[in-house]
Amino acid sequence: LTLIGIAVGVALVCAVLALRHESERALSRDAGLYDLVAGGKGSPLQLVLSSVYHLDSPTGNLPYSDFKRFQRDPRVLWSAPVGLGDNYSGYRIVGTETQFFDLPNREGHPFFEFAQGRVFEDRFEVVLGSQVASSTGLELGDTFFGTHGLVEVPGAEVHRDFPYRVSGILAPTGTAQDRAIFGTLASVWEIHETEDRLHSAIQGSALLEGHQKRETTAILMRLK
């Protein structure tokens, strides 16, 4: 019995160490994609977890003009906005722009590859991470509705007036991007601005001046 107990104990320790090593490798793969992440004031860890790993809540928003400014900066090789707010079956819908998929790896080759389809072209087209496609069973041309919030919660508001259509499915990357749904930042703006106008009309109040200024949750960057 002692020998069996030792063997089981050693096996458990080895399994934990292997899982830890694999987790560290996965975290390093994600962190190595970007050099800088810009976001609202708050915890730097929370900012990275929410915008890179799709795990935590965002720290706040930035004006979209900040993204355009970074995009023009000669020190920036690549940049892309990240807009959060909705999910589908627990997978976050990430609003961004087409250059998101132009991200190069550290050898200068494209990081993202399409297993099927293409990048989004219309406002409510989306690209699925590999895990999203395999878990949900969504295929090219399928449509679905996003749900308000970053996680799946019973009774959460479903945006039934704004159907998404799948235009592409990414090849596995071994990163958190496999667990995300990528759509246009413009679609995120349209959904939530429409809701704000509706809620204001119901409450009999006007939107605050400047409320509808374009914003982004975070900005991902790779430097030259």
List each language-model region with its residue ranges.
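Beta-strand-rich non-transmembrane domains
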Residues: 84-89, 113-127, 144-175
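Short beta-strands and strand-coil junctions in structured, solvent-facing domains, enriched
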Residues: 44, 99-102, 134-135, 152-154, ...
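Small-residue packing motifs within transmembrane alpha-helices
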Residues: 3-5
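Hydrophobic, regular-secondary-structure patches
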Residues: 7, 11-102, 110, 118-122
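Mechanotransmission and gating elements of multispan inner-membrane complexes involved in transport
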Residues: 158-165, 169-224
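Short, solvent-exposed hinge/capping segments at secondary-structure junctions
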Residues: 99-110, 127-146
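Soluble periplasmic/extracytoplasmic beta-strand elements of cell-envelope proteins
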Residues: 35-39, 92-95, 125-127, 143-145, ...
